[in-house]
């Protein structure tokens, strides 16, 4: 059995662009929780936003915070009510804790739980550290065919799955996706897995378009080619860019669905355009029940995640990982909390 230390190393955000390494106590699992030794943690745009701005909307970093919520690892200890046979199993973590008692939770919409505790959302610590705790049923077993990196990236894959579910993507659909970054690429793969026959990714970056094409999407340069005649059944915005959202709405056929995944605060919405064409405009907020679907998509090979990883860093390089996320040559950046430094973080050119 693995000997568990009393303290661990954590990368802690104390304020805007103020990261330090600290020794923290190793958390002790409650009766319904497991203790996970962290293997891989993906860097998300929200981590970058907290690092650069210290807040996202109403969530403010006003006390020290550990970032990171895309997590995989290995169970090393369990609470009193958890089967000890789980110790040693590799897992992917759904990084949230709903109350399980409110109307939303009882209806199955636990992502909307007003009491939600979500990794790396103030004041809840995340996973840029050696160990984390999570309720037993939110630590999903993964087979050896799924790597630690891919298991961590089941979190952004869950975003893509939730977008496809909310859009109601079905066999034969045409799907337009704005943005060829990680979420756009993942959403394109999920759309194909859900049966879409024409998946179009629009991005102004030639490098991102080339990458999206390598994953089987049809690509367009929205600055040079109109998509209005595409008449998509479903439009998914993964760009957060106002012009892309406006164009995507115009490119959605009557009765179609617009799913907002990107982070634009506001955009002009033509109410007559929506009302007279009976468009369904919706958003997604995280996900519910997506990890088993994500695992099945990875095991079947319908979705590939390992090739999205472009950079890998150690715990001493979290600031470097956060500073480089979002650049054109970067798709997914991974932090290995139990490694101090990686000499050559770039593992593949995203081109």
Can you say where each PLM-predicted feature lies in the sequence?
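Glycine-rich beta-strand-centered segment in the early N-terminal region that forms part
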Residues: 27-41, 56-103, 143-145
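C-terminal hydrophobic helical "lid"/dimerization subdomain
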Residues: 1-10, 246, 288, 292-351
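Mid-domain Rossmann-like dinucleotide-binding core that forms the NAD(H)/NADP(H) cofactor-binding site
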Residues: 144-224
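NAD(P)H dinucleotide-binding glycine-rich loop of Rossmann-like/cofactor-binding domains
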Residues: 97-178
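Glycine-rich cofactor phosphate-binding loops and adjacent beta1-alpha1 units
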Residues: 167, 210-280, 342-344
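N-terminal glycine-rich cofactor-binding segment
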Residues: 10-28, 45-77, 92, 113-123
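Residues in the short beta-alpha loop(s) of Rossmann-like NAD(P)-binding domains
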Residues: 204-205, 264, 287
């Amino acid at each position: 059995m693995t000997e568990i230390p009393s303290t661990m190393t954590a990368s802690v955000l104390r304020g805007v662009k103020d990261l330090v390494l600290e020794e923290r106590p190793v958390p002790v699992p409650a009766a319904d929780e497991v203790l996970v030794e962290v293997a891989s943690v993906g860097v998300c745009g929200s981590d970058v936003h907290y690092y650069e701005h210290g807040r996202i909307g109403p969530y403010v970093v006003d006390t020290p915070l550990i970032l990171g919520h895309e997590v995989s690892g290995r169970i090393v200890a369990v609470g009193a009510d958890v089967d000890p046979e789980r110790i040693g199993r590799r897992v992917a973590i759904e990084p949230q804790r709903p109350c399980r008692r409110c109307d939303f939770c009882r209806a199955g919409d636990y992502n909307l739980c007003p009491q939600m505790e979500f990794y790396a959302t103030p004041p809840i610590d995340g996973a840029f550290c050696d160990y984390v705790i999570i309720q037993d049923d939110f630590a999903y077993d993964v087979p050896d065919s799924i790597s630690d990196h891919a298991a961590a990236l089941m979190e952004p894959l869950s975003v893509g799955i939730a977008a496809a579910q909310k859009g109601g993507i079905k066999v034969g659909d045409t799907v337009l996706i704005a943005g060829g970054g990680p979420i756009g690429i993942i959403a394109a793969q999920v759309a194909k897995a859900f049966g879409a026959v024409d998946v179009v990714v629009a991005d102004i970056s030639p490098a991102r378009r080339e990458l999206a094409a390598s994953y089987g999407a049809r690509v367009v340069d929205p600055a040079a080619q109109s998509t209005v005649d595409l008449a998509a059944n479903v439009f998914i915005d993964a760009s957060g860019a106002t012009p892309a959202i406006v164009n995507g709405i115009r490119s959605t056929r009557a009765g179609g669905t617009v799913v907002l995944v990107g982070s634009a605060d506001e955009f002009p919405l033509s109410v007559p355009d929506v009302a007279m064409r009976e468009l369904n405009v919706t958003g997604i907020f995280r996900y519910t029940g997506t990890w088993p679907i994500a695992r099945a998509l990875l095991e079947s090979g319908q979705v590939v995640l390992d090739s999205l990883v472009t950079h890998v860093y150690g715990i001493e390089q979290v600031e470097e990982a956060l500073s480089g996320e979002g650049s054109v040559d970067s798709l997914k950046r991974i932090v290995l909390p139990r490694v101090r430094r990686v000499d050559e973080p770039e593992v593949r050119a995203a081109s």
